[in-house]
Amino acid sequence: MAVPASPQHPRGYGILLLTLLLKALATTASACNHLRPQDATFSHDSLQLLRDMAPTLPQLCPQHNASCSFNDTILDTSNTRQADKTTHDILQHLFKILSSPSTPAHWNDSQRQSLLNRIHRYTQHLEQCLDSSDTRSRTRWPRNLHLTIKKHFSCLHTFLQDNDYSACAWEHVRLQARAWFLHIHNLTGNTRT
């Protein structure tokens, strides 16, 4: 006669649950840890590519009055997840605007492609990190921050259209992109130290 299996002890379930939780946390940590070394160089290298991509214009540009202001104090956060989401959103908008087929002829296309590839790779790494951290955190991203960023980039697109995608209008956008890379540097530097 077979001996009936003894029922599993409740502590056994607790240990199993704890093991699974620790494994999930370790996966999340490893998915995000690879960003730390990249954070240190991403903005600096991107700024260098942006500078190399768009040499100085042969003519002086008139002062453009683009009403695309952005209150950068809205970006202040010590929450790594929120900083990652914000950085991801900014990079998606930068990628979209800089990959436009109407960029000026004097821009170095290979440098622009290198910058776009860099943005794309970093965005993918952020997506992996955000996807893995979704398993343990469901904090909501401030909607007004998302809308403010979206409104700013929409304004830049309109500005380009209104100025017929002129080289001077693109110079204004390039300067805005420079400011965004500096914001990203501050976001990632403040939350991963």
Swiss-Prot record:
Report the CDD domains cross-referenced here.
IFab
- Signal peptide region: 1-31
Alphabetized UniProt keyword annotations: Antiviral defense, Cytokine, Disulfide bond, Glycoprotein, Secreted, Signal
**Compartments in which it is found:** Secreted
- Enumerate the SMART domains for this protein: IFabd
Reading the lineage from the top rank, the first entry is Eukaryota
* Molecular function via GO: cytokine activity; type I interferon receptor binding
Report the SS bond pairs. C32-C129, C61-C155, C68-C168
Q: Which GO terms describe its cellular component?
A: extracellular space
Q: Which GO terms are recorded in the biological process aspect for this UniProt protein?
A: adaptive immune response; B cell activation involved in immune response; defense response to virus; humoral immune response; natural killer cell activation involved in immune response; response to exogenous dsRNA; T cell activation involved in immune response; type I interferon-mediated signaling pathway
Report the InterPro entries cross-referenced here: 4_helix_cytokine-like_core, Interferon_alpha/beta/delta
* Glycosylation positions in this chain: N65, N71, N108, N186
Task: Tell me its family.
Answer: Belongs to the alpha/beta interferon family.
Explain the purpose of this protein.
Answer: Has antiviral activities.
UniProt-recorded name of the protein: Interferon type A1/A2
Gene that produces this protein: IFNA1
